[in-house]
From Swiss-Prot:
EC number: 5.2.1.8
Family note: Belongs to the FKBP-type PPIase family. Tig subfamily.
UniProt protein name: Trigger factor
Gene designation: tig
Cellular component terms per the entry's GO annotation: cytoplasm
Reactions performed catalytically: [protein]-peptidylproline (omega=180) = [protein]-peptidylproline (omega=0)
Region forming the signal peptide: none
Domain of life, per lineage: Bacteria
Subcellular location: Cytoplasm
Domain notes: Consists of 3 domains; the N-terminus binds the ribosome, the middle domain has PPIase activity, while the C-terminus has intrinsic chaperone activity on its own.
Gene3D superfamilies named in the record: 3.10.50.40, Trigger factor ribosome-binding domain, Trigger factor, C-terminal domain
Membrane-crossing residue ranges in chain numbering: none
Single Gene Ontology BP annotation: protein transport
InterPro entries given in the database record: PPIase_dom_sf, PPIase_FKBP_dom, Trig_fac, Trigger_fac_C, Trigger_fac_C_sf, Trigger_fac_ribosome-bd_bac, Trigger_fac_ribosome-bd_sf, Trigger_fact/SurA_dom_sf
Amino acid sequence: MKVKVENVEKNVVQLEIEVDTAKFEEGMQQSYLKNVKKFNVPGFRKGKAPRNIIERYYGEQALYDDAINIVCSEAYDNAIEENNINPVDRPEIDIVQIGKNQNLIFTAKVTVKPEVELGAYMGVEAKKAEANVTDEDLENEFNKVVEKNARLVSVTDRPIQSGDTAVIDFEGFIDSVPFEGGKGEDYSLVIGSGTFIPGFEDQLIGKNIADDVDVNVSFPEEYGKEELNGKEALFKVLIKEIKVKELPTVDDEFAKDISEFDTLEEYKNDLRNKLEESAKSKAERDNEESVIQAVVGNATVDIPNVMVEKHIDAMARDFDMRLRYQGLDLQRYLEIMGTDFEGFREQFRERAANEVKIQLVIEKISKVENVEATDADVEEEITKTAEAYKQPVEELKKTLRPEDLEYVKNDIAFRKTIKILVDNAKLN
């Protein structure tokens, strides 16, 4: 096999690959064996015609497609490995020469991983995040706990106020006609939460139990349902109950009820410790992010658009999966947000480009600094994963493919490199 490599444009190479006749003949024979049952040749039962007869009857071109796929795929893989080429997309294949008793010649044009020009990366200056927890932070968090443990109690001696929970029946009408999804019974609506259409909740303030209320609202122009967008609507509402939050008494008994501690002081001390741990973790993440951005900002790399597009694809798939866990799908989300798929993808572009650059720059530093995952690193990572999934380590190992192990090694090297950069950074 002969290979010529030419840089045809920025981050794009073209390989001219020549495969000898014998190798192409092997591909033709494999194509014949794969397709022989598809050919009808007079005088032969289907699938029994010899190859030379099929080629004479249909022309040898009838076997070219699969032969090309078989031969070109193997030749291309060998060529990029031998020439240390790192493609980031599928190649564009063009046949230059093909025929009986001829070497197969084809070109493969492909986008490759770009070269990274590193700037300063060891000892970079970055803003230091502090892990401070104030008394005010503690009180705010404690108040959330108290609110969470509040109970709703009915009130009958006053009208609805902001912050109350109103239990209502309602039915919506547009032009005096009920519309789908506009009806509910025994619905608990927190007044002032903004859960319903703008203006709906405000019109219930001052109303009493058993009141029938006509609520007039306008759906937003981009509400998410075409039949409701911008429409005027009337809701017939019955006030069935008014509830208010009753906060628990904050004392040692409260601490005992919600925790393993006997006193309120012990509970608050534990809460402060947890807040401090959380603040410390956040500060570490923020410091890491500051260092990474400083390092990446000092580097130069011309990122191929295809790498950004692929990363956007992955981000969109991940977003869609998270939506499905919440009982939504991407199409419904786009309707609610009043956008289309292209607009949705575009919102990821800047972040995707930044994340691709981070990946490329850190990979380059790993290579320059000879940062690698050791066997012990890989073993530890596999053990952690097995424990997380409550699976025996040896069973998990059996499921790992070579590419899975390669991914684990690369990920470990990536994280080790970032740690080196952070440890050597000047945080101030």
